[in-house]
Amino acid sequence: MKKDVCIMYRAMSIEIVTYANKSQGMFEELVNNKFVPIKVLGWGTEWKGFTDKIIGVLKYLETKSDTDIIVFIDGFDTKVNKKTDELLNLFQKCQCKVLISRDPELMGGVMSRTIFGTCRGNSIANAGLYMGYVKELKLYLKDTLEPKCKDDQVNFNTSCNKFDFIKVDEDEKIFKNISPRSLNKESNAIFVSYPASPSFSRYTRAFIEYTQFVYIHILCLLVVALVAFPRYKTILVGVTLGLTAFYALAADKSCTL
């Protein structure tokens, strides 16, 4: 398995890294791609949560020069779509220090923005693909660890608005996230990711993590439904009690309480 790359451009280096503690999903295809080697962080470690990735990257950044460029790509959902020859040129054209991929808004625009917020405009930043200079990445990633919220995507968007050196890859020439609804869609981006690929574990995790953002909205709808459709009172009360029990006992509430 190839784990190291250091492509030199003048006085700086560009390094492509991922974080994975095991082989899963598209990992083998990623690390054995024909275009560029990948540096793997976190291999063999115990997975504790999404902040593991950020902590792992930050630790690695301490070994790099401030002017180096690090590209982070998700280890289980991403492929290197083509040669990386134009990577530096495309990044410099963005005129920013940190570039983050655009989220595909899997839950629809309104719901996705309700949960994640936005990054410097109307776009949602996706935490699975990003790149930047080491100096600015350190500032940004450290800030994403400050909130008590455990969701890296929420924190990425919250922190994004604090720094004017960050942009979202609106043109999607470097990064492209493709939703499960558009799997046959072609992309000319260098790095292509397929976040939220269908699996039972992902759906379960999403239900646990994201109920906190929509619980009040759903509860209000259920109350309205009870008033509007009294003949379904037994069913609606059961659903309300079940949802409330799940929220109280199992749902993550770190981002809303």
Specify the residue positions occupied by each region the protein language model found.
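Short beta-alpha junction loops
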Residues: K22, G44-T45, D77, D103-M107
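Catalytic core and acceptor-binding pocket of nucleotide-sugar-dependent glycosyltransferases
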Residues: S123-I218
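N-terminal anchoring/stem segment of glycosyltransferases
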Residues: D4-I69, I216-T256
